[in-house]
Design a protein with these regions (language model features):
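Substrate-recognition element of Asp-dependent hydrolases with the DxDx(T/V) motif
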Residues: 60, 69-108, 126
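C-terminal cap/substrate-recognition subdomain and adjoining C-terminal extension
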Residues: 81, 98-191
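Short, well-ordered beta-to-alpha junction loops that form the rim of enzyme active sites
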Residues: 14, 87-90, 146
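Active-site neighborhood of HAD-like aspartate-dependent phosphohydrolases
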Residues: 1-51
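Hydrophobic alpha-helix position signal
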Residues: 22-23, 76, 113, 134
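Short glycine/proline- and acidic residue-enriched helix-loop micro-motifs
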Residues: 51-58
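Short hydrophobic segments within beta-strands
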Residues: 6, 86-88, 143, 162
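Flexible, glycine-rich phosphate/dinucleotide-binding loops
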Residues: 20, 92, 168
Length: 191
């Protein structure tokens, strides 16, 4: 099978980072912990959002991968599956930070995957909408966390929703919820 894997929120934990770092940075309490976008989590302006990522982007992208991601991905590879990293990272960096650019984000992601021992057959940098690439690479399962992407992708293939506060209410046909990387492995092995 062809397995697509998102980065932010799937390989790299995002929800708690935004809440913990945002609470300190903005000196505010969380307004809505079930939102994907930090602007809505803290009810902040686009300018405040950009300032946050200017300061925090490198700290965020340099953190280690989610526990067992590497281990499970290697097990999937050993079982003959092709692994595609499909990410919007590095396609619109200028929209939220001046600290790094798209090229840096792409180059650093490749380095980060290597540092975290994350196996892949190919890395696909795509715009926020991933459906065209999912169709092109005939992805059987896409592991995704962003609510909008989960819904769009579920129209064309199976989505393993990496569960988070912000996507708990996203349900539907072709959407299977997973709570950990070993949970993901069990879902794929079952099919």
């Amino acid at each position: 099978m062809n397995i697509g894997i998102d980065v932010d929120g799937v390989l790299l934990e995002k929800c708690n980072f935004q809440i913990e770092e945002g609470t300190k940075f903005f000196n505010k309490r969380v307004i809505n912990s079930k939102e994907y976008d930090i602007k809505k989590i803290f009810d902040i302006s686009s300018l405040e959002y950009n300032k946050f990522w200017d300061v925090k982007i490198k700290e965020y992208i340099e953190r280690p991968s989610i526990k067992y991601a590497s281990e499970v991905i290697y097990k999937l590879k050993e079982r003959g599956h092709k692994i595609y990293i499909i990410t919007a990272r590095g396609t619109a960096t200028k929209n939220y930070t001046d600290t790094v650019d798209d090229d840096y984000m792409k180059t650093y992601l490749i380095k980060w995957l290597e540092m975290n021992n994350i196996y892949y057959d190919e890395v696909i940098f795509t715009s926020d909408g991933k459906v065209n690439d999912i169709n092109k690479y005939k992805i059987n399962y896409m592991i995704e966390d962003k609510p909008k992407n989960i819904i769009e992708i579920s129209e064309v293939t199976n989505v393993i929703k990496y569960s988070s506060l912000y996507n708990l209410n996203v349900v539907g046909k072709n959407i299977i919820e997973a709570y950990s990387w070993y949970d993901i492995l069990k879902i794929i092995e079952k099919n």
